Design a protein with these regions (language model features):
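Hydrophobic, lipid-facing positions within transmembrane beta-strands of outer-membrane proteins
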Residues: 66-72, 214, 272-278
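Acidic, low-complexity, intrinsically disordered peripheral segments
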Residues: 377-463
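Surface-exposed, charged secondary-structure patches
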Residues: 516-542
């Protein structure tokens, strides 16, 4: 996985395009800094001038001329326009830098997704192959029985239909594997490795259990938020630079020239000049005021984009982190599901072989097992992908994999970088708290639905015989026993202990140690399941 991701971030066009944009932004800063230095120009000319002046004798005159001139100019004051432009382009460069980091992390995530999807569909193809083999085995058995005259034709047709479906499923999974391999080639730049490898177990490293802590990490580190903040600062510098249009520009100029008949003056050999030039625009139709209003609106737009980026990151990391918890719980349930269905399928096959189960029962069990294994394989891959999504959302995927892709000469750019007062204003750090459903409570509700059936009078064959009715004492004991179990599954320690007498003492421990052990067991994570079957009660006396 790490090798595939490293290859992707080194060669993917999305990353290299951002890198070239960063380099261009760095050169643009140097372009603006050139305004701090003087401009030096060299000019040379050769030609012939003709003129006619009636007060001169002769009135018409022609001169051959040539000359060489050197001039230099230096901006002395421009209302801080150059300084603000350099500042704006510096922030624009940082924007490109953070966009480069974001593209690197996003490409690392996409490469991880492509790698995991290839592994996913290789597993699904293998499961589809096994499913086809099982259906082919059942079909061949029925064909043999049918040809021997001991099987039914309708069973053979059913088996043939299910075999065709298994073949279709295999074809679909192979097509899916082809498609994700093509996506892998696009992102990584090479074909997937021929053999499957274990997924890097480090994907879960450093992920905090609390959703709010993970959100805090993401909002503090994600480069898309940092890029939006620098974009806002660039807009602010641009607006400050617009104020320079209300001030004059002062420029120093020096010029010297040599030549023959230089500058149209006969016999002139040399010409030198030095001057200070002030230029102050007094009116330009209100364009400067309109430009100030325009830049103010652009600042507001950049602030909106910053808050939008923050909210996007907050949503992304919250969903990815919640998917981790969801998929961890799902895998436990799906594992139990696969084991139970596998046992049922094996039992159905044995019963089918001795004629106690129909073919439809067996084929349904095979399909259910295939579906269960497919769901488990998908959940396994989705969990690894959820780890990767969470790492990428808090900008730690490449570092978790031990990889990096730095642009040369950029380390000092963000050495002391901080969001400071430019952090997002409309993006509070909030975690969504959805109350988890207690399986113990749901189980208790299910048992309450069964109470009337358990306490109802049994139906007897002879109407003349009185139906036995459970005594109130027996019904009360049964209900109290269920309440005791419900309190334990709901982790209500005080309610659970209330069912015991104050002088109750366990046979192998003290009462205090027993209570402490009960509380320790209840405090463990996970659900408690307790099933009471075949409750036997007997009333003594009236």
């Amino acid at each position: 996985l790490a090798a595939a991701v490293q290859q992707a971030i080194n060669n993917n066009p999305d990353v290299t395009a951002r890198l070239n944009a960063l380099r261009a932004a760095a050169n643009e800063v140097d372009v603006a800094r050139g305004q701090y230095l003087p401009s030096v120009d060299l000019s040379a000319s050769v030609g012939r001038d003709s003129d006619r002046i009636t007060s001169r004798s002769p009135a018409s005159q022609s001169l051959s001329r040539n000359g060489l001139a050197l001039s230099a100019s230096q901006i002395l004051w421009d209302g801080m326009a150059t300084s603000k432009e350099v500042s704006r382009l510096g922030h624009a460069r940082l924007t490109r830098y953070f966009e480069f980091l974001g593209a690197t992390e996003e490409t690392a995530l996409e490469a991880t997704r492509a790698y995991l999807d290839v592994e996913r569909y290789r597993k699904l193809v293998s499961l589809a192959e096994d499913n086809y083999v099982q259906h082919k085995y059942a079909f061949d058995q029925l064909q043999t029985k049918f040809k021997a005259g001991v099987g039914r034709g309708v069973d053979a047709e059913q088996a043939n239909a299910r075999l065709a479906l298994a073949e279709s499923n295999l074809t679909t999974e192979q097509a899916n594997l082809h498609d994700v391999s093509a996506r892998y080639l696009r992102i990584v730049g090479d074909l997937p490795p021929a053999s499957s490898a274990a997924v890097n177990p480090q994907l879960s490293k450093g992920i905090l259990p609390a959703n709010i802590d993970t959100i805090n990490q993401a909002l503090a580190q994600h480069p898309s938020i940092s890029a939006a903040i620098e974009n806002l600062r660039a807009a602010q510098a641009q607006a400050q630079g617009a104020e320079s249009r209300y001030q004059p520009t002062v420029e120093a100029r020096v010029r010297t020239g040599v030549g023959k008949n230089f500058d149209g003056v006969q016999d002139q050999k040399r010409d030198s000049s030095a001057e200070i030039l002030l230029n102050w625009n007094l009116f330009n139709g209100g364009s400067d005021k309109a430009r100030v209003r325009q830049y103010a609106d652009l600042i507001n737009q950049a602030a909106d984009q910053r808050d939008r980026a923050c909210r996007d990151v907050r949503q992304t990391v919250a969903i990815a982190h919640n998917d981790i918890r969801k998929l961890q719980d799902q895998l436990v349930a799906l594992d139990r599901n696969v084991l139970a269905i596998e046992k049922a399928r094996d039992a159905y096959r044995q019963q089918f072989d001795i004629g106690q189960r129909s073919l439809l029962d067996l084929l349904n069990a095979e399909n259910e097992l295939y579906t269960a294994k497919r769901s488990y394989a998908n959940a396994e891959t989705d969990l690894q992908l959820a780890y990767a999504r969470t790492q990428a959302a808090k900008y730690s995927l490449t570092s978790t994999l031990g990889l990096s892709r730095e642009a040369e000469g950029t380390q000092e750019l963000v050495q002391d970088w901080q969001a400071a007062d430019d952090a997002a204003q409309r993006c509070p750090v909030t975690a969504i708290d959805v109350k988890a459903t207690s399986l113990g409570e749901l189980d208790a509700r299910a048992r309450k639905l069964a109470v009337p059936a358990l306490t109802a009078a049994p139906v007897v064959a002879a109407p003349s015989a009185p139906a036995p009715v459970a005594s109130p004492a027996v019904a009360t004991v049964q209900q109290r026993l269920r309440d005791w179990a419900d309190a334990w599954m709901a982790k209500d320690v005080d309610g659970y202990l209330s069912f015991y007498a104050k002088d109750f003492a366990p046979s192998r421990s003290t009462s205090a140690k027993w209570i402490a052990e009960r509380r320790r067991l209840v405090s463990k994570t996970g659900t408690i399941e307790l099933t009471l079957d075949d409750i036997q009660t007997q009333a003594h006396g009236d």
